């Protein structure tokens, strides 16, 4: 044991510790719905994890933004000194919408992002600022990306401006790279990230199958991913 402690002391930092000393308490954010809680955590009294990535996928008008805002409201209500960074790619968040959902607008920052690179940069900088704050001065924080499917890439925009009719093959790798950088940082900071995403029909599947857009990047790092059905498919 002394040997292990010496290793931790020499090669570790504040996030390196013996497994027995790791805080094993699983914490959740109530989604505002017992059914939704049970779907994402296995308990009606649970919810989404407080330090992991949760993906909410579905077709248009299936309630992705609705559930995301419900989670934001419950998070802010539970943490009176907490705040939320809402990365909006659809210009869907308005003062009227927030007021109708009872969300404290003074504790929510709406960040408009157009490209994956822009989201990656702004999210990483925000987490870095949070981690540099003294731990006792850190207030509860959560991130929302709504939605991943609407993010473009710098290459796609450049090609469009130059009237190049070519397919952008870089998006999947950019998505994977962005979440590869963010996953551990968010975990260290205890910042939950809710990501909404679009789905598409898998061509050639034996049974009707839905898949999230953007490649496997989000699917491989999300602690929980939930696909919302359309009314006619229920």
What are these language model-derived features?
Residues 91-92, 116, 193, 201, ...:
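Alpha-helix N-cap/helix-start and coil->helix boundary motif
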